[in-house]
């Protein structure tokens, strides 16, 4: 979802739970509030009732009965992933800061470009989507997850000798990745 709406316009499209209202009140930046609301608009358009979404202690969204979920938003874009198997999604604006933190997520065995901000952001998105999907505390992105960009816009990620599919895309100055827990 390309977030072009004003916060009030997004809010008017939704009937928010008290929990959502409380969370919104605690968000300082308008871009964060708009991302939060855009995710809920996406959920509504996918017929996922907002009041049936719960959060684990580490912040992972889930439904007691229903599909697996993952959400992400960054400045002007929001994304959701819904699946019958665990999924993870991440969208990020490509920023120079990624170069400074690369050592925290680049694994020496990654088969990925790391020579540009865009390439590093693509890699970060895949690893962050994997982290959201796996949801195991203590995962070290630079040691526990490896990534192989096998083909244009898709590849395989590995965690504990299990392989998972991922898909990624980039546009203007954004990157997005989707991971799916399907053993190959």
Where in the sequence are the language-model features?
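Core catalytic alpha/beta fold that binds nucleotide/phospho-ligands
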Residues: 1-184
């Amino acid at each position: 979802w390309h977030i072009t709406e004003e916060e009030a316009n997004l809010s008017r499209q939704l009937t928010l739970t008290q929990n959502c209202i409380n969370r919104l009140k605690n968000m300082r930046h308008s871009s964060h509030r708009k991302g939060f609301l855009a995710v809920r608009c996406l959920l509504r358009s996918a017929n996922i009732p907002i009041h049936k979404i719960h959060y684990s202690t580490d912040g992972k969204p889930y439904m007691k009965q229903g599909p697996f979920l993952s959400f992400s938003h960054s400045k002007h874009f929001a994304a959701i992933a819904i699946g019958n198997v665990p999924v993870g999604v991440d969208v990020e604006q490509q920023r120079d800061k990624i170069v400074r933190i690369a050592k925290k997520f680049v694994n020496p065995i990654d088969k990925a470009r790391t020579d540009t901000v865009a390439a590093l952001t693509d890699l970060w998105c895949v690893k962050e989507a994997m982290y959201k999907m796996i949801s195991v505390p203590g995962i070290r992105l630079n040691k526990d997850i490896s990534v192989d960009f096998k083909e244009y816009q898709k590849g395989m990620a590995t965690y504990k000798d299990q392989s998972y599919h991922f898909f990624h895309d980039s546009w203007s100055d954004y990157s997005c990745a989707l991971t799916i827990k399907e053993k190959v």
